[in-house]
Amino acid sequence: LSEKKRDEYYKIIKEKATAWAICAISHKIIDKINILNASLLGMKKSYEKLRDKGYKVTILLCDGNKTPDVDCPVEAIVKGDGKIPEIMAASILAKNHRDRLMDKADKKWPQYGFSHHKGYPTKEHYEALKNYGPCPIHRLSFRLEDKKTK
């Protein structure tokens, strides 16, 4: 989906969905427990936010092949963001939330171009890392240099 389409769907989903929750996991936690475990932790915390607000989750559908440890039925669906509308919606919410965090980071550290690459490992991002080193929000466990820019 284009960024414009995602923004449109983001607004519709937030307005029309019965319930939704987002949990951002910090770069420090990701460095400590790895990206997969951080994703599972985010799923678990998002579920707990809904449960704690009184929503009864009958099944938690997760994109991928792993599931978080939660107190409700859970199902992993590989490539679920291309198959299951609820996972598609969750994916749009998460991506837009992350993009907005990257836009805020761009205001604080404009030399990295976060609003352009949204934190993904593009040539532009690797060039910025080569020129400026990591900023306080970079995941140090991620390969911070690209073989092509060496």
Language-model-detected regions and their locations in the chain:
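RNase H-like, Mg2+-dependent phosphodiesterase core
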Residues: L1-K150
